[in-house]
Amino acid sequence: MISPSIPAMPHDVPDATTAQAGPRLVAIIPVGALDGAKSRLGAVLDAEERLDLTLHLARTTIAAAVAAGRVAEVLVITPDDTVRVLAANLGARPIRQRDSGLNQGLAAAREEAIAGGADAILILPIDLPDVSSDAIDEIAATLGEPQRPLVAIVPDRHGRGTNALLIAPPDAIGLCFGGSSSTAHEAAAAAAGARLIVLGGPLALDLDTPEDLLLAEPSLGRGRPADVA
């Protein structure tokens, strides 16, 4: 079973200043309260296993974003003290979420990114078992010196949710997470006159249902909860 303990600061986590030259891209990772996390997996995982899985996913996502060569800074927006400690230990900047709701929290983090000089933001949920620094850099590679706003979306495997969202400039469109957010973000991009790029790849799989968990087993590997067959 994945240990929920918070790791020490890894020695090989690159400093954000080592990101490649170019537009300043800030990754934003929202992490909700750990209480009741992944409740939709309650049929196959007990509360402790869901907590372990959530911490494992948060740790993996934050570390991948910090290691991505095209990401200048990683912000983790969360109401949870444990997650803020985890984020800081991994080299990200934790932000306390004061408003309830995913879009409200992301809006606050976006303001922080803009205040820090971000040219673009990349929003990454933590429930992506195939996340890696390479997958993040592949999305970031869509960011050049656009003559007009740019929106790049990785929809979920059903084509409904948004598993990754790059926006340049950071406030080019509103945030529409929840429900059929992929369609909503595409519509927002069209309304803003933004260039739209829809990507596939490993980040199309997210962990919402028991079926998703089975599909993710090869990626979770030895870190998966012990009772998941």
What positions do the PLM features span?
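A short, N-terminal amphipathic alpha-helix
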Residues: 54-70
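Short acidic/His/Gly/Ser-rich catalytic and metal-binding motifs that mark active-site loops
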Residues: 34-40, 84-86, 161-162
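Conserved donor-nucleotide/metal-binding helix-loop-beta segment in metal-dependent transferases, i.e.
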Residues: 131-158
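Acidic donor-binding segment of Leloir-type glycosyltransferases
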Residues: 71-94
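Short phosphate-binding loop-to-helix
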Residues: 86-120, 177
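Short beta-strand-to-loop acidic/aromatic patch adjacent to the donor-nucleotide binding site
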Residues: 119-127
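N-terminal nucleotide-binding beta1-loop-alpha1 segment
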Residues: 2-41
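Conserved alpha/beta core of the MobA/IspD/sugar-nucleotide pyrophosphorylase nucleotidyltransferase superfamily
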Residues: 4-18, 180-229
